[in-house]
Amino acid sequence: MNKKRLTAIYVVVALMLVLILLRLFSMQAIHGESYYQMSQQKVSSTTVEKAPRGEILDRYGRPLVSNRMGYSIQVKKTGLPNNELNQMLLKLLHLLENTGSPYQDQLPISQNPPFEFSFQDENGDGSTEDEKEKWFSERKKITKDMSAEEIITYYKDHVYSIEDGFSPEDLRRLIGFRYDAALGGFSAVNAYTVAEDVSMETVTQIKERQNEFQGVSVVKEYYRTYENGTLAAHILGGIGKMNAEEYQEMKNDGYGFNDLIGKRGIEKVLEKNLRGTDGKTNVIRDIGASDEVSSISAIPGNYAVLTIDTDLQKAAEESLAKHVAQISTADAGAAVVLDVTNGDVLAMANYPTYNPASFNQDYAELVQNSAKPIWNRAISGTYTPGSTLKPLIAISALESGAVTLNQQIVCNGIYDYYADYKPKCWIWSESHRTHGPQNVTQAIKNSCNCYFYEAGRLTGIDEMDRYAAEYGLGERTGIELPDESTGQMSSPAYKEKIGTTPEDQKWYPGDVIQTSIGQSYSFFTPIQLANYIAMIANGGTRYQPHLIKSIRSSEDGSVVSETKANVLNQAEIQESTLKAVREGMYGVVDEGSASKTFANYPIELAGKTGTAQVGKDKANNALFVAFAPYDNPEIAVAVVLEKGEKGYNAAGVAKDIMDEYFGLNKEKGETVNYYDLLP
C-alpha cells in the first residue's frame, strides 16, 4: 500500500479517536451529572379502561338495555400528503362498505349523481325547511342559491383540495368523510371515529393490512344491547358519538373526544346517571428498578329503573301493529297506559317503530320514510280528539251549572238552534234516526252530538277552555322525554292566531258547538288524553306522568334517587258529576259503540270511542280512551289509530292491553324482582 495513503488513514483514525475521547470527556466530566439525572428519570404511561354505561331496566328489573364489547375504527391525521390521504381514506371507506360496517355520513346531499339535497326531517313532522335554513346559516361561503352539484364542486376545490380523477360516487364518499371528520375535530391530536360497532371481518382486514392504513386504528368499545329488539325504541332512545359542539360543552365534565353519549330518549335524559367513571392504569418505568403500577378500576354507570312493564309494552306494540295491518286505511298509531294512582307510565307504544340498535346506520332511510317511524306519536303527535272529549265537555257543562244531571236535551237528528247552521248528529247521518231525549249519562253512552251541541252552546267556550286546562289539555304533561307537544284546546284566541285573513280569524257560534264534540281547533297528544281520563278515574287528581322509577347504584344497588308521585292539580269536581260521567263511559263499553269489542269481558271498565275527522277525502282517525277496573281504577288507556276509520277499532288495541294487564290471555308468569339483579 502507498505510504502516503497509509499515513492518511492513520491520521483519520487518530482524529476519530480524539473526537470520541472529547465526546466521552464532555459526557462524563462536563455533562455527567445531567446525564446521570436523566438516567434516573422515570417514564410513565397511562392506559384508560372505559367504563360501561349503566343498564336500563323495566319496573320489575328485567333488562331493557345492557352492554357488550365491540370495536370502532378511528382515524388520525398523519404526515401523508393530501392526495395520498384521500387515496387511503377512499380505500378504507370501500373496505367498510365491503365488510358490512356502515359509516356515518351527515352531508345533506345524495350519495349518487345527479346530486340533490337530502335534508333530514329531524323532528319527524314531515318538514325539512328548518334543517335546511339552519345548515346554510352555519356556512359562510355557501349560499342558498347554490345547487347540490355546485356545493360538491366547492368542497372539492376550495375546502378539501381533492385532486381530479375520482368518479362522482367516490368523490361524494370522500367529501362526505372529510365533512364529517371536520365536524368531529379530525386532526393529528384528535382521532375521528369513522365507524362504530364494526364487523369482525372489518377488524381482521384492517389489522392484516395495517401498512395500507396509516393513522387507522381498531379500538375496543362498549356498545348497547337492546334486549327486545324494537321494543320501547322511542322511550329508550340511543347513544352516538358526540360532535365538536357537544365536545366543547362536555369536555370539562371529563368526556373524551370519542366518547359515546346519549343522543335520544332515556339514554339522553339520564346521560349523567348512566355514564360510568373510566378506570386508569398508570405504569412508571424506573431504570434499574421494578415498575410501579397503580390502577383505579372503572365504575359502571348507575342502573335506571323505568316504570315500563315489558310485557305490557310488548302487548301494546304488537296490538298496534296488528290493528294497523287489519284496517286497510290505517298506517300508524300510538297507545299510552298510565297508573291512575301515581302517574307511572306502564306502556308507551308507537307504530311504526324502528330498531334502536341500528338507528345510526338506518337514519337516512328512517327520516325519509313517509310513515315517520322515528316520531314519538305518543307524546309529540297531536290529534283531533273527536268524541273522546265529550266526558270533559260534560264535566264543564255540569260543574258550571249550564246543564243539570237529569236535564234532557232532545236529539232530533239535526241541531236547528241556528237558522243558517244546522249540524247533524252522527246517527242521523248514518241512518236518519235520532236519539230522542238524552240526559248527560245517556248522551255520553250514545255519543249524541245534538246533546253536546246544546250543552256546549249553554256552557260557552270560556268555561270549556277553563275545564280543559284543569284537566291538562293544551299543556305539556311534564314527561321526562324531550319534544313533548303542548296540544291545543279550541279557542277564539287560537283561531285569531292562526287565521290569515280577518274572516279566517273570526270566531263563530259554530266553532263553539264543534268544539263541544271534539272537532274545531282542538288537538291533543295520546298522553294528554290518557292523563285526563286518569283524572276521571281517580277523582280529579292530575299527576305528572313519569317514566323514571328510580336510579340505583351499580356497585351496591342502593337508591340514588327515586321519583315520587307529583300532583300537578287537584280539580274540584262534585261526586255526582263524576258518577254521571263514569256511568256514561261504562255504558259505552256495556251497550254502546265499544260493546262488541268488550262483550262478556270479565273486567268492568269505562271508556269512550272517538271518530275524528281529519280532512276532506281522508279517512277518519280512530280513538279510544278508558279506565279499569270500573269500581277501583288502576289504569287509564288512550289509543289513536291514524286513519283507523272508527273509534271501536282503537278499542281493540285497548282490549289487548287490558288482556295483558289483567292476565286474561295467559298464565301470569312470575316477575323478576329488581333487587335480585343487583350485585
Task: Enumerate the predicted regions with their spans.
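Membrane-proximal periplasmic segments of bacterial cell-envelope enzymes
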Residues: 1-272, 278-292, 296, 326, ...
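Beta-lactam-recognizing serine transpeptidase/beta-lactamase-like catalytic domain environment
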Residues: 65, 71, 283-295, 308, ...
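Short alpha-helix boundary/capping segments
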Residues: 80, 84, 573, 642-650
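Solvent-exposed, polar/charged alpha-helical surfaces in well-ordered, non-transmembrane soluble domains
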Residues: 83-94, 196, 204, 208, ...
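A conserved hydrophobic secondary-structure block that centers on an alpha-helix together
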Residues: 291-341
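Conserved helix-loop functional segments at active or binding sites
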Residues: 322-326, 351-354, 587, 663
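Amphipathic oligomerization regions
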Residues: 642-664
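Flexible helix-coil linker/hinge segments at domain or subdomain boundaries
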Residues: 663-672
